[in-house]
Amino acid sequence: MTKKILSIVALFIALLLSACTNNDEPKYGYLVLEWDSSLNLTSTQIIMPQESRTYGFKAENVKSVTWENVPEGWTVSMSEDNSSISVTAPAESSVSGITYTIIIVVEGLNGEIRKQELLFLFVNPKAIAYDDPKGIFVLNEGNMTTENGSLTYITPDGFVIDDAYKAVNGTELGNVCQDMAFDNGKIYIISQNGDENPVGTTFENDGMLVVLDAKTLKKEKSFSKSELSVLDWPTHIAVLDESHVYIRDNKGVYRFDVNTKELKFIEGSEGAPKSKFVVMNKKVYTIIDGYISKLLEITADEDIVNKKTLPYSAPYKEIYSIGKSDDGKIWLSAFGFGKYYIGKYSLEDNTIVSRQISIMPSSGASGVSFVTKGNDIYYASGTTIYTLKFDENPELGDESGLEAEAVLCDLNSLDSNAKELYNGLGINPATGMLYVNTIKGVGPFYTTNSIWEFNINGDWTTPQNKFDNYTNFPAGFFFANNN
């Protein structure tokens, strides 16, 4: 009797287990879905017009793959071997800075549904307001033998447009771009070689001087090397108006009228060095060295310089570069009698305050050896960034600057690829952020590079942002409404 009862119980358990197994086993097997492990599906992808992003995956027991929330003009497609999905932004659009979420829906044969969100930030170069003072321009020389110049733009939100000029116009800037200036809603960009380099290689580009709309970057005028054939390797530009565009070359300074194409040499500017102009009070300033250093002042009234001799008390034999101060004076970096200086010169009463620094500040071909925010001076030697809190107290001597100088950081210690700085620093007047360009080296190494952004009041061991491998021999930093 006991054996019979046990047999019945065993049979019941077997039937119960069988029933459970039959209920759990799907008719078609489980949905298997694995996205490419190299993809960061949780981050927002920056995408520009006509650009595509591809997402690889492996799947089994799939009934269908569909997509939802696709914006108008965007396309989503599956590869022929059903191993990836591509998302393409529209070629034309009137918007920029919009975030979109496209949902990929995968349904299994067993009815299971899995959804994957793909996040995109649509950045449209043709719909950006480039005259925002918080934006950052990086003008690139390009490789003299093989490529044209370009204009990198970093939006106030920190998104990089690799060549904004080309993205807007469909054409390229001249070979070896050197400098740019802002005036009355326009940007003026000068290149060293234009459409032909010194060995006779021709390039397809927009020439030696390009004038563009400061808000849209659309080209308005351009001038080829043949139209400006008098110029010998131009390096710097300053603008008072369309009839007074000043260009420095190996001879000196010329005035160019973009409407009449008149190009006239400024008498007395012979030997003006590679140094960025200062534009202040409707006048243009540059420098000239000699036994006694001088400022060259140029006005729209006449094509001749007014030479301003620095005080005899100034211990300078060579001026590296000049800059505009917030209180209408002129900053300068200089050398004399074995010492290096930062000075502040008053045009009104011809007085100068000097403070000694410990190193020769780097400038490269940009002619920018320092930048300022108020009375705080920033400069570099090698890959080391320095600052000087400039105290104008007349009771202090020149040597007081050595005590006020401080080392902020060595970029090479933060990134071993930062082997050298390329051209001068930049500081955005609207944000106070400081910018530095570094490269791994010349030759094949220049493509390994970084744009560094530092909060001058923050931690100098960690940049606020760092943008890698965007530049092509950067000529310098530029900011809208900062001529």
What are these regions (language model features)?
Residues 24, 34-67:
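Solvent-exposed, low-complexity, repeat-rich "mucin-like" stalks and linkers
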Residues 159-172, 218-228, 261-268, 304-313, ...:
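A short beta-strand motif characteristic of beta-propeller blades
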Residues 446-483:
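Blade-level signature of beta-propeller repeat domains, shared across WD40, Kelch, NHL, RCC1
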Residues 1-45, 110-136:
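Bacterial Sec-dependent N-terminal signal peptides
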Residues 256-384, 392, 396:
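Acidic, serine/threonine- and glycine-rich low-complexity intrinsically disordered segments
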Residues 42, 68-84:
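Low-complexity "stalk/linker" and mucin-like segments enriched in Ser/Thr/Pro/Ala/Gly
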Residues 172-181, 229-238, 270-282, 314-325, ...:
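Repeated scaffold domains used in trafficking and secretory/extracellular systems
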Residues 142-146, 193-203, 252-253, 291-293, ...:
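Short glycine/acidic-enriched loop and turn motifs that connect beta-strands
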